[in-house]
């Protein structure tokens, strides 16, 4: 069997299994999460190259489902967050981002798993964090907001989720400014109630 054939079969299985055992449809959610700052872009974190700093975040989050596919385990949500950072600097952050939620994993009968991706949002902080300043001390209060999240729940209790989130602020590779700073990245753990 060729590699392409195996890939097509895997994708078909990922789509078909969740359709056979579709869960409840939730339109709203509220939750909270906490995390610690790390000093690389999200790609660096996934490669094990992150170092953690003494900057922390506590946040409230809410989301609303805007669209749900009738044939795929896919939906679009609008996610908002309000957070407080402390440690190296104390500041408040507010952000909003459209998020794709993929719920089609073959093991969902054992552990319901959802992947949430929000690559293009808006984040604003009450001040520029010293961790976000470039070589010449410049930074931006308003940056892009990106999140990558894995959410887990019991198949019989999908309204209660725990999640792991990569919370990322950035200038989109200097598209928004050319100060040479990465922005901020937090590895966070949280809880969400869906209704």
Regions found by a protein language model. Name each.
Residues 28-32, 71-75, 115:
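Short coil-to-beta-strand
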Residues 32-36, 42-48, 75-86, 164-168:
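Transmembrane beta-strand segments that form the barrel wall of outer-membrane beta-barrel proteins
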Residues 52-56, 70-72, 90-94:
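Generic alpha-helical scaffold signal
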Residues 59-81:
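A glycine-rich, hydrophobic loop/mini-helix early in the fold
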Residues 66-68, 81-187, 191-195:
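Outer-membrane beta-barrel transmembrane domain signature
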Residues 1-26:
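Cleavable N-terminal export/targeting peptides
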Residues 19-65, 192-193:
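Short glycine/proline- and aromatic-enriched beta-strand/turn motifs that initiate or cap beta-hairpins
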């Amino acid at each position: 069997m060729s590699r392409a054939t195996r890939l097509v079969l895997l994708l078909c299985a990922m789509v078909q299994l969740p359709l056979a055992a579709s869960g409840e449809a939730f339109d709203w959610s509220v939750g909270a999460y906490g995390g610690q700052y790390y000093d690389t872009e999200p790609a660096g974190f996934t490669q094990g190259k992150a170092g953690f700093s003494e900057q922390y975040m506590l946040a409230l989050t809410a989301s609303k489902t805007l669209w749900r596919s009738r044939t795929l385990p896919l939906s679009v949500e609008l996610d908002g967050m309000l957070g407080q950072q402390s440690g190296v600097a104390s500041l408040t952050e507010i952000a909003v981002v459209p998020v794709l939620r993929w719920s089609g994993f073959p093991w969902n009968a054992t552990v319901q798993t959802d992947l949430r991706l929000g690559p293009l949002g808006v984040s604003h902080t009450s001040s520029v964090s010293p961790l976000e300043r470039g070589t010449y001390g410049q930074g931006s209060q308003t940056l892009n907001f990106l999140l990558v999240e894995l959410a887990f729940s019991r198949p019989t209790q999908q309204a209660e989720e725990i999640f792991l989130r990569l919370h990322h602020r950035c200038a989109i590779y200097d598209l928004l400014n050319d100060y040479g700073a990465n922005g901020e990245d937090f590895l966070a753990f949280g809880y969400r109630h869906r209704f």
